[in-house]
Amino acid sequence: MQLPRWWELGDPCAWTGQGRGTRRMSPATTGTFLLTVYSIFSKVHSDRNVYPSAGVLFVHVLEREYFKGEFPPYPKPGEISNDPITFNTNLMGYPDRPGWLRYIQRTPYSDGVLYGSPTAENVGKPTIIEITAYNRRTFETARHNLIINIMSAEDFPLPYQAEFFIKNMNVEEMLASEVLGDFLGAVKNVWQPERLNAINITSALDRGGRVPLPINDLKEGVYVMVGADVPFSSCLREVENPQNQLRCSQEMEPVITCDKKFRTQFYIDWCKISLVDKTKQVSTYQEVIRGEGILPDGGEYKPPSDSLKSRDYYTDFLITLAVPSAVALVLFLILAYIMCCRREGVEKRNMQTPDIQLVHHSAIQKSTKELRDMSKNREIAWPLSTLPVFHPVTGEIIPPLHTDNYDSTNMPLMQTQQNLPHQTQIPQQQTTGKWYP
């Protein structure tokens, strides 16, 4: 382990000597040196013991200042460092923490918090939590053990338990001792119990809540369960009356007379309050009838033989292929009969059609064919609206028409087409006689 150099521990003027090898430290410097060495070794090798009670909220803060002195180079007395530090916590010998213990740390520049409600099953059993601190700037690590000795609590569990949902708090804010103390004080003024304990604190995100938007300083919300030894007060019972239940179903705030005692610091959602009376709960535990511990005789065990009997799969193979093939063949024959043998044919259709209808349709088809042939052979000018920028026959570029030089109101529609150069002329119809295409 790297220790501070001796001339950095005190004032150089405090050293005296009569020559080389005869230097002495003053009493003040000696005390500072021993205190520094003791603090370094005690922080690295010491374990902390805590004694929470079963069924009572346990909170342990992992202070960054406590671990800063464990990362080399060790700071001098009075030196301030603000390195980012994160923590990893797990049960000794296991990759994670016990089920009742939670951990939260918002940023590497804030303290971590271990919190939870110890269970009665772990009473008398020391729970060793390994805490590993990581310095994100120097990549140094430091390890510390937290020994949790769970003690049995009196009157565990408390018979009357109430769970409140506080909308304007995050879980790490609620875990602060002064904030939690203020909330318990407000509950005590409303409930008036002789014994009041915080049982558990749960973030709303762990109950399926949504992450709030980063606007208007919105909070996640936190559930706080408290227990007392006296029945619920009339103020807490007001949530159960029909009027308030109806308002909650309509997403309206219920009318609670004691809400003003919390409103100064805590915004409570009274529609989500839960009141549990342990004295009225029916126990579903059934007494276990212990027997002799001997299983009933099921006869002699006969394991299967080593040599398995061979099985012929030829019949199964034929059935698997023959049945689908036969069905497919029948369907094919039915389809072939319908397509080939049940067709009318053109001759049968013409025989059943009257002659005048056949002549009418044949004339229409003949006229249609003649029109198509004529449309292929005719040579007429294209309309101006479809003229390209070049001539469709010669490929020469046609100059654009400037309509400003002409009086478009008096100009015939076909005059422009007749005056265009290289324009194909429309054949004129003869005035005398008949003309056939």
UniProtKB/Swiss-Prot annotation:
Residues in compartment: Extracellular: 1-317
Membrane-related topology note: Single-pass membrane protein
GO terms for biological process, alphabetical: cell-matrix adhesion; muscle organ development
Glycosylation-annotated residues: 200
Tissue: Ubiquitous.
Post-translational modification: N-glycosylated. Ubiquitinated, leading to its degradation by the proteasome.
Mutagenesis or variant effect for residue 60 to P: In DYT11; affects protein stability; the mutant undergoes endoplasmic reticulum-associated degradation
Principal subcellular localisation of the protein: membrane
Parts of the chain on the Cytoplasmic side: 339-437
UniProtKB keywords: Cell membrane, Cell projection, Cytoplasm, Cytoskeleton, Disease variant, Dystonia, Glycoprotein, Golgi apparatus, Membrane, Transmembrane, Transmembrane helix, Ubl conjugation
An example Gene Ontology CC term for this record: dendrite membrane
Effect recorded for residue 115 to C: In DYT11; affects protein stability; the mutant undergoes endoplasmic reticulum-associated degradation
Keyword 4Fe-4S: no
Subcellular location: Cell membrane, Sarcolemma; Cytoplasm, Cytoskeleton; Cell projection, Dendrite; Golgi apparatus
Top-level taxon: Eukaryota
Residue ranges that the Swiss-Prot or TrEMBL entry lists as coiled coil: none
Membrane spanning stretches: 318-338
Pathological association: Dystonia 11, myoclonic: A myoclonic dystonia. Dystonia is defined by the presence of sustained involuntary muscle contractions, often leading to abnormal postures. DYT11 is characterized by involuntary lightning jerks and dystonic movements and postures alleviated by alcohol. Inheritance is autosomal dominant. The age of onset, pattern of body involvement, presence of myoclonus and response to alcohol are all variable.
Cited function: Component of the sarcoglycan complex, a subcomplex of the dystrophin-glycoprotein complex which forms a link between the F-actin cytoskeleton and the extracellular matrix.
Family: Belongs to the sarcoglycan alpha/epsilon family.
Protein name, UniProt field: Epsilon-sarcoglycan
Organism, scientific name: Homo sapiens (Human)
Gene name of this polypeptide: SGCE
